[in-house]
């Protein structure tokens, strides 16, 4: 049996459970035209994309919304969007196409093998109940030397995040994402962490979202 064809499970059943097991499509049925990450995080991400993504590439923005944070000056062959809310995806003008799918209930990505150069996931991994299967699918659709770029902070809709995320420290989350990646078709990821010293005021108005990013190349 070829192990490359099957996802290697990392989580147990308890770790996949969520506080709110209700339908995800219903929760995301109303568009949320707000930024879930602060301006500093978004700038860090755009700067990283500027460095990491080659011009004339095909990019998949998985579990996306109305803004992809992709640099406007870069030239893309194609940008494909995915998410759960049609209105949000329609507003994202950088998309050449998009589709709607709940990856927790339907794990196969409807794209051809080796058809994408980069897969982006922003503030998304924390909602995956079956990350192993999805990671294997991402490896399938990525081109040779294709990359996955996963970015997250310490924010989430906590009732919709599985136990593995809500019960872990920030450092444990990084280790968990890494383990899934290297177990399911990716090389050792590059890990980026950026923190800002707490602002010296009692209200912490100037504190910034921590920035975590894992970049891994397909095996």
Mark where each language-model region is.
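Short alpha-helix
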Residues: 44, 168-193
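Class I SAM-dependent methyltransferase Rossmann-like catalytic core
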Residues: 2-54
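Conserved class I S-adenosyl-L-methionine
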Residues: 147-178
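A short acidic, Gly/Pro-enriched loop at the edge of an enzyme's catalytic core
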Residues: 106-119
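Class I SAM-dependent methyltransferase SAM/SAH-binding core
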Residues: 51-109
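A short SAM/SAH-binding and catalytic strip from SAM-dependent methyltransferases
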Residues: 117-132
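Core SAM-dependent methyltransferase catalytic element
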Residues: 185, 199-219
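A short glycine-rich, Lys/Arg-flanked "PGG" loop and its adjoining helix->strand segment in the class I
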Residues: 132-147
């Amino acid at each position: 049996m070829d192990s490359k064809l099957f996802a290697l499970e990392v989580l147990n059943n308890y770790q996949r459970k969520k506080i709110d097991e209700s339908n995800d499509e219903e929760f995301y049925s109303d568009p949320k035209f707000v930024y879930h990450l602060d301006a500093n995080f978004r700038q860090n991400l755009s700067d990283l994309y500027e460095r990491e993504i080659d011009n004339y590439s095909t990019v998949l923005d998985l579990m996306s919304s109305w803004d992809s944070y992709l640099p406007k000056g870069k030239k893309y062959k194609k940008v494909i969007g995915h998410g759960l809310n049609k209105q949000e995806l329609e507003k994202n003008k950088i998309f050449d196409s998009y589709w709607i799918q709940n990856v927790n209930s339907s794990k196969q990505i409807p794209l051809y093998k080796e058809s994408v150069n980069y897969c982006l996931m922003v503030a998304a991994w924390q909602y995956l109940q079956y990350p192993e299967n999805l990671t294997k699918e991402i490896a399938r659709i990525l081109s040779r030397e294709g990359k996955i770029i996963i970015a997250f902070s310490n924010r989430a809709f906590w009732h919709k995040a599985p136990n593995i995320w809500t019960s872990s420290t920030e450092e444990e989350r990084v280790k968990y994402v890494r383990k899934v990646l290297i177990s399911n078709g990716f090389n050792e990821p590059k890990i980026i962490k950026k923190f800002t010293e707490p602002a010296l005021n009692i209200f912490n108005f100037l504190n910034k979202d921590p920035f975590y990013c894992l970049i891994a190349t397909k095996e």
